[in-house]
Amino acid sequence: MPIAWWHRDERYAERLAPGTKFADIIGEIDPAKLAGGVSMASEEALHLGLIPRMHRGIFAMNELPELDELVQVGMFNILEERDVQIRGYPVKFDIDVMLLFSANPSTYNRSGKVIPQLKDRIGGVIHTHYPKDRARGIEVTRQEAAVDLEGEWPVRMPPFMEAILEQVTIAARNSKYIDQQSGVSARFSIANYRTVVASARHRGVRLGEKPAVPRISDLGHLPTSSLGKLELDLMGSHQMSERQVLDAVVAEAIREVFEEYVDRHGLEEIVQGFAQGVKVEVSDMLPSEGYRRIVEEVPELWERAFEVNASADAAVHASCVEFVLAGLYATERISRIERHGRTIYDTGGNAGGL
């Protein structure tokens, strides 16, 4: 038998369990070989499945509870006895292969189960878990999102925006309104990260700004990437919609990060400026250079934005201004009105906050 090098991609195979047959993963008598004159009693008549073909490799079966129970029996026979019968012919497998299985939480496995005999033969069980802290979560999200922030239209992501995006996920994972048995996956963070970057880049292209810098107003696009990824707790959410729950966790995330980044001392001076009737209107398509003009009546706001990030870049400063405004709203110091894609901050009506 010739010796050849297998690339690692060739030494790994996976299969989605629903609809998988015994012949797919173990093997079957090949009618074409029989027609060619090969005897049914010969091993040459066999067409081997994925597991034998992954000798000295790795085979993964996804959604294991959805695998037919008869096929699961064949799986544990290979795991323990290393043999199996194909159409009545005993076949001994001398294979060296690592078998991996994946399964979602029990709430998603209503139509199937893993038979006890197969569970007994599985060497170890690993329960996936959430990142231990926000910093690690940001690293995972940044890595898995795999977004190119450079290129013709670069994007500069402020640290507080990354922190808010990850804190949204953390808040969702701790929310009493969300079914925690189903959980909130990393896909939630990844999709939101990509959405905010795309929104900022879209603004950069439309307005000719380089680099584009994500702002709080870009979070207004999160429903497009978040809705459908949160499973509500029917007992805890009562009459709240998924959109309302999302708005609540976003507000909580902004408040949490704002209190970490911004010193409370001096905030009342900004609030007093709004108490004089000042209104500040922002949007995701407002040019960055325009932020200096719209906050001229509240110079303390402009100064506090510099404390968040001292960059002289107008786009960075615009993002900081929105961050301070959103933080003041989230901590119930000023109010906010949203209409037609624009956000107006003032002290009229009831102060916001959730």
Task: State the predicted function of each range.
Residues 61, 179-186:
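Short, charged/polar micro-motifs that form catalytic or ligand-binding hotspots
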Residues 28, 78, 168, 216-222:
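Short acidic/histidine-centered micro-motifs embedded in hydrophobic/aromatic stretches
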Residues 181, 201-354:
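C-terminal engagement/docking regions of AAA+ P-loop ATPases
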Residues 48-49, 162, 185-191, 270-278:
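Amphipathic alpha-helical surface "interface" segments used
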Residues 1-4, 8-13, 17-50, 55-153, ...:
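Canonical AAA+ ATPase core
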Residues 109-113, 119-182, 204-209, 232-240, ...:
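Conserved C-terminal "switch" segment of AAA+ ATPases
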Residues 163-167, 187-205:
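C-terminal helical "lid" of AAA+/P-loop NTPase domains
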Residues 96, 159-163, 183-190, 217:
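An alpha-helix initiation/capping motif
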